């Protein structure tokens, strides 16, 4: 796969060169993009704010894989769902806020119009929510139909199936039932967010006691590691959080604590 990085030149910024390469205009909303054949990105050293360029590159490379696997027949929402899911990061707090606001109101896209949420978003929030809804479709598929359902849907698109054809073929239910299940899944996600938000803040001694009683509990260990980090016992925090991530590499709080310490190490 050809990878292109753009830097400032001839009075134009790196992002302007990248944008011109991708859309023929001096501005595009993102900093990295894939056509399915190449990956282009604004040079990380040319950005005003730090960016996880490895995360961006992985995301775009998944687009290359899924677009080529399906002969470019994959819907926009599904290639984004798989690309975001491959990053392996917890759902952003901003997305949780959008879910809390929009799911109860029923302000949602569905399989028929979700791709338009990227093409004609109308606002940054709508654009972010399109990503959020897309990856939650993938998570819903895994929970209800199993991990293999993701690759089965890819294969259906490879065989030139439309989404209307692919859903009953891959999942064994009609589209209405599939969408109903997705809506129920979103309700559960929102309930989980509210439950987390409603939990009272634990006192330091409670966190420590909970960890001492439940050292094999990844959440208890991650909370204690976060506490140790905050009181400057970074070596102890790192030992505990590394042990959690070794067994649970995608644990949200452990990943956050580990990343926070790495950022502080760089300062």
Predicted regions and their residues:
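Juxtacatalytic substrate-recognition/specificity segment
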Residues: 1-75, 86-95, 101-108, 112, ...
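Beta/coil-rich, acidic/histidine-enriched accessory regions frequently appended to metallopeptidases
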Residues: 123-129, 155-267
């Amino acid at each position: 796969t050809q990878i292109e990085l753009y830097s400032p030149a001839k009075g134009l910024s790196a992002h302007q060169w990248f944008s011109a390469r991708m859309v023929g205009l001096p501005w595009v909303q993102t900093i990295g993009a894939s056509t399915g054949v190449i990956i282009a990105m604004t040079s990380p050293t040319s950005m005003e704010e730090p960016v996880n360029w490895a995360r961006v590159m992985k995301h775009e490379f998944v687009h290359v894989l899924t677009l080529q696997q399906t002969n470019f027949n994959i819907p926009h929402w599904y290639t984004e769902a798989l690309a975001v899911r491959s990053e392996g990061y917890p759902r952003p707090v901003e997305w949780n806020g959008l879910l809390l606001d929009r799911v109860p109101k029923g302000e949602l896209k569905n399989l028929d119009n979700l791709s338009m949420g990227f093409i004609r978003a109308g606002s940054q929030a709508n654009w972010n929510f399109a990503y959020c809804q897309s990856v939650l479709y993938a998570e819903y598929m895994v929970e209800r139909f199993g991990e293999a359902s993701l690759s089965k849907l890819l294969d259906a698109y490879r065989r030139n199936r439309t989404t209307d054809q692919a859903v009953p073929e891959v999942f064994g239910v009609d589209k209405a039932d599939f969408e109903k299940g997705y809506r129920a899944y979103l309700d559960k996600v929102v309930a989980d967010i509210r439950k987390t938000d409603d939990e009272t803040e634990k006192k330091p001694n409670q966190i420590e006691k909970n960890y001492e009683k439940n050292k094999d509990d990844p959440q208890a260990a991650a909370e204690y590691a976060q506490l140790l980090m905050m009181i400057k016992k970074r070596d102890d925090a790192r030992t505990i959080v590394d042990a959690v991530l070794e067994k649970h590499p995608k644990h949200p709080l452990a990943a956050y604590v580990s990343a926070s310490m790495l950022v502080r190490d760089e300062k």
